[in-house]
Amino acid sequence: MRSDETQVQHMTGLVRSIQVGIPHDLPPEHLDDQPAHPWSTGIFKRLVRGPVRLHQQNLEGDGQADLIHHGGLDKAICVYPSEHWFHWSSILPQQQPIGGEFGENFTLEGLTEADVCIGDVFSVGSAIVQISQPRQPCWKLARRWQIKDLAVQVQQTGFTGWYFRVLQEGVVESNRPLRLLERPYPEWTVTTANRIMHHEQDNLSAAEHLSFCPLLSFSWQQTLRQRSRQQASPDPRQRQFGDLHS
């Protein structure tokens, strides 16, 4: 048996907690030297107790305010590893994690970006999910925690988490295992994808190579392909800081 087949058979994580939340309109808030603006977000999640239905585009009771950059088939579930709390505990004002601090739906234990790959297929409860792309943090995470450059910090550390698409709808529950079923692209860890996207902007061949991974989300394929062809791509400051980046 090949080593990668053995790895697939034995790789398991734990869904420590599940969070959902619907979008809310929030009043203006000042953030450092930035002017106050009202904002709408679904980043504030509540813990789910007991089983919850996982649909093709989201968990029951979950929603996103910005449907252009969040949600959809490739971003049905946002996932974040609990292992990163040790790093963020010295930066965020909250002392103990309760789940959902980064707006995630699944808070995991036992799997990080270095352990999982684009296209990995997992069973969770009666559902089947697949990794589509790393998460790209936006300005709403910074606004939530009142730390202006938090999205940039998350991106630079590589502690981004990732997204699942849903291959089979089902019922999921916290404190249940997440079991790896298939690994079609072991070369494309989430860590590697993050590095190519955010730290190796001049590596055009790597961008092109990753862009042709068929299980990578369409938006990442498009961005990387534009880069490899030296075409204009979106300014990341818009995502990281919103309309106040200039």
Regions found by a protein language model. Give the residues of each.
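Hydrophobic, well-ordered secondary-structure segments
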Residues: 160-161, 175, 190
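Loop/turn positions that initiate beta-strands
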Residues: 119, 169, 173-176
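Electropositive, beta-rich accessory/interaction domains or terminal extensions
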Residues: 2-142, 149, 185-246
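Short, structured beta-strand/loop micro-motifs enriched in basic residues and often containing a Trp
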Residues: 102-111, 154-164
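Short beta-strand His + acidic residue motifs that chelate non-heme Fe in jelly-roll/DSBH
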Residues: 131, 164-166
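Short hydrophobic beta/alpha edge segments that flank linear recognition/processing sites
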Residues: 178-181
